[in-house]
Amino acid sequence: MITTAEILKRAKAVSRKAPLTTEQKNFALAKMAESLVSATDDILKANALDVEKAKGTITDVMIDRLKLTPERIKAMADGMLEVAKLPDPVGTVSDRTAHKNGLIIEKTSVPFGVVAIIYESRPNVTSDAAALSFKSGNVCVLRSGKEAFGSAFAIVKALKKGLTDCGIDENYINLIEDTSRQSANELMTAVGYVDLLIPRGGKGLISACTENAKVPCIETGTGICHIYVDKSADLEMALNILDNAKRSRPSVCNAAEVCLVHKDIAKEFLPLLYNRFNSGENRVELKGDSGVVEIINVTPASENDFDTEFLDYVMAVKIVDCIEQAVEHIAEHSTYHSESIITTDKASADYFTSAVDSAAVYVNASTRFTDGGEFGLGCEMGISTQKLHARGPMGLKELNTYKYIIKGNGQVR
């Protein structure tokens, strides 16, 4: 097994090479996508072993996150091809100033260098992160969780073949083979080798990285996403949005976890919500505050339920007196990911979008749209819930920093 230290040395060495052209990167992405599809059988075999080992240790919903199919692998390859079609951010001049002495000052996008990604049980993150890192001019160091390691290893093997097939150093994409906490800690403290660290996973992983990292770290959020049903809401629309935001894929970070309902419509709306979530497949367990349990027969919610990312068919429900109370609740319990208001009142919509301090704020739409693909970014590196550098879905532009390039003809000061 290659040590983490050796992988980081190789990655840093590659990051210092002459940059690849846009044409080289796009051709390589196409080759990697082709290689990924060609390796479908090997990837599925590795994934089947991962799934078998994980059964009984993680929930069925998380098993779905872990499981790959030929269709999902094809979607991963298609995602790489979409990244190839996107504009190359490297070398983009975002600001240009002509000094009175003739100097030309250009603010120019450049790669970070080595980007490390620590993630858990989602094999598709492997190809998404590799594609975005590569197109944005970075070298990636991937550290998968143990549940998905076999799948990640097979995926990286295919991607490396795609690189070597077009004569590009395979060490642009690297996978840490040690899935222990020690390897994660090594990445967090690899000053001089890791230029940017991005954790993708649960609250524990993200907290560990933000608290212990000595390298620059972007906090990608857990998703305690709220949907507020205003007193003026179209109730059928609200039901459809809540159904989608909770049941379409509950294990992802943009799924809704909390529903806030205005008191004026609670007696009419809550029975409708209860009936909707108790019909069809994948019924949703509702946990309600004291006002909710007086109207519908659901489990009483604890205070902790409003601070829980369930990642399952469970939702906490609370009645609020007014929109201001809804916003106050969100401010207290949100992870600053995605929130939505269902309303027909423009003043309420404007107040909500202004007052709620999250990365994505919706009006009359599902929180499930907070996604790089849906936002036109191709795939995504993660959803940043911080305010510095990047916020919301992180695409190619967010994987570049900038430098000032100053051109003169002999000026001195």
Where is each model-derived feature located?
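C-terminal core of ALDH-fold dehydrogenases
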Residues: 27, 323, 328-413
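ALDH superfamily catalytic-core signature
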Residues: 2, 120-140, 158, 162, ...
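Short, well-ordered beta-strand elements within core beta-sheets of diverse protein domains
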Residues: 13-20, 260-261, 312-321, 336-341
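Rossmann-like NAD(P) dinucleotide-binding subdomain of oxidoreductase/dehydrogenase enzymes
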Residues: 85, 94-232, 236
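N-terminal Rossmann-like NAD(P)+-binding subdomain of aldehyde/semialdehyde dehydrogenases
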Residues: 1-105
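Flexible, glycine/charged-enriched surface loops at secondary-structure junctions
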Residues: 20-26, 90, 166-173, 249-255, ...
